[in-house]
């Protein structure tokens, strides 16, 4: 098995928004990337995505030798993984599809090469059931877009080797990611669980007429989101306790956890709520296209990363 520090060739299977984002990230880090997707328009769509992401990646800092010319789109899955030293799967979130695809990847990928799934919620235990060698299958869950958001959550399944989890975690670190290595499988992992709680509350407030989509977005971007970008919710709450820290925070505000504020059960996504949320987002876009909004988001995240000192000097171990 190639060491994480010496990987040169990465295969990306699935080239949609997430898979394409991975392709862009790995290219920017100087890897040779082979990609495969069964969609007939996969290659031009993927190359457009990479081209659109490249200015942002350039601002973030490219590794030595990084080039979009290092991308090869293959005709078959088998061609994509034939010489791969790491495989990132990013197929649609359908359990049977993931299960079958991981089994195919396991059969086609050279022995010992770690295969990671970008699944946003399925436990690897449920996906590795038909693979001949489930020991090398791990979850490597990114955040959209993978070329911009540093976080990756890594966790294995019941039949995954601990060495594969450790290898994947180290590889992602070498590839410029911020890694959480989870000891236990949790449906939805960590960050999505937290996002989901906020999302449910937001939908309830829109459904009940308590807040508009604009109100909800502003409440985060102009409020706690600014603090969370620096140190996260837990440490932010600790600061709210003053010199007493989190202990004082819990003593003072802990009882309010039992207040009937939250409605953590999912709301009924009826037509009225659906239309209200869609209309609110259209209003917030104010005529800007999705491409315009993506570019605006990317510029903003780069500036947040720069302002919080997370861009650092360019590093390249390849």
From Swiss-Prot:
GO terms for cellular component: cytoplasm. Pathway: Amine and polyamine metabolism; carnitine metabolism. Pfam families: 3HCDH (PF00725), 3HCDH_N (PF02737). It is an enzyme of class 1 (oxidoreductase). One of its GO terms (biological process) is fatty acid metabolic process. Its EC number is 1.1.1.108. NAD(+) binds at residues 14-19. It is found in: Cytoplasm. Coiled coil: none annotated. It catalyses: carnitine + NAD(+) = 3-dehydrocarnitine + NADH + H(+). GO terms for molecular function: carnitine 3-dehydrogenase activity; NAD+ binding; oxidoreductase activity. Keywords: Cytoplasm, NAD, Oxidoreductase. Homodimer. Belongs to the 3-hydroxyacyl-CoA dehydrogenase family. L-carnitine dehydrogenase subfamily. PANTHER family: 3-HYDROXYACYL-COA DEHYDROGENASE FAMILY PROTEIN, 3-HYDROXYBUTYRYL-COA DEHYDROGENASE. Catalyzes the NAD(+)-dependent oxidation of L-carnitine to 3-dehydrocarnitine. HAMAP family: L_carnitine_dehydrog. This is L-carnitine dehydrogenase.
